[in-house]
């Protein structure tokens, strides 16, 4: 007898669904009908798309009885700040491996990381060059202290993390069914490619007609 797949662990963190907003004046200026998906409204310290990924990453972490989340990024990483905020909200320990030296003064996301109680490790260029190994070394030290760590790669770029934007794409499809335009293109910025991958999965599963276009930022198209 066929059995259904087990539910995918998920922690509801985002304020969703986020609205679709037509950019009236910009559309008139450019002669193209433009809409924006307001994922800047997902909540929890302006976490944007990161919180959607973390719903599934943290869900998997908790399913594995993790009490510590380990991730990495630049000194002003939005993703690291988001992980720190989620850990503060859920009572988990956050360990952030950040690229660069400890500054004399703290500002921006780095200041928020500290205020949120994250344990910050500053990585040398050599440590950053082998960041996967560095993260596993940190995890080993956490285990030696009796903790149960869960590693989140930079920007949450895993298959599990991509499920966040599968859910977002399903949300868009639902909004289209309830009166939003049938978009012919959905454009999204690309760093790791995870969010675009999630939208492509949603396109296949929901029948969205839009072409999913990723626009690389900071790194080249070949890397994405």
Annotate each language-model stretch with its function.
Residues 1-221:
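PLP-dependent amino-acid enzyme catalytic core
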């Amino acid at each position: 007898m066929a059995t259904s797949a087990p539910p995918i662990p998920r922690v509801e963190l985002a304020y969703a669904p986020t609205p679709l907003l037509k950019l009236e004046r910009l559309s008139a200026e450019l002669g193209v009908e433009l809409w924006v998906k307001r994922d800047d409204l997902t909540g929890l310290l302006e976490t944007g798309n990161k919180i959607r990924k973390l719903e599934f990453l943290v869900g998997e972490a908790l399913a594995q009885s993790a009490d510590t989340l380990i991730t990495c990024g630049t000194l002003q990483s939005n993703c690291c700040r988001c992980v720190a905020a989620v850990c503060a909200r859920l009572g988990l320990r956050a360990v952030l491996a950040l690229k660069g030296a400890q500054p004399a003064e703290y500002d921006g996301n780095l200041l928020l990381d500290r205020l949120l109680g994250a344990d910050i490790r500053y990585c040398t260029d050599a440590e950053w060059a082998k960041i996967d190994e560095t993260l596993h070394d940190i995890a080993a030290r956490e285990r030696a202290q009796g903790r149960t760590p869960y590693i989140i790669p930079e920007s949450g770029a895993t298959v599990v993390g991509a499920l966040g934007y599968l859910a977002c794409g399903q949300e868009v499809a639902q909004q289209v069914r309830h009166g939003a335009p049938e978009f012919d293109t959905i454009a999204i910025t690309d760093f790791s490619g995870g969010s675009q991958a999630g939208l492509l999965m949603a396109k296949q599963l929901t029948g969205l007609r839009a072409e999913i276009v990723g626009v690389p930022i900071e790194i080249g198209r070949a890397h994405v």
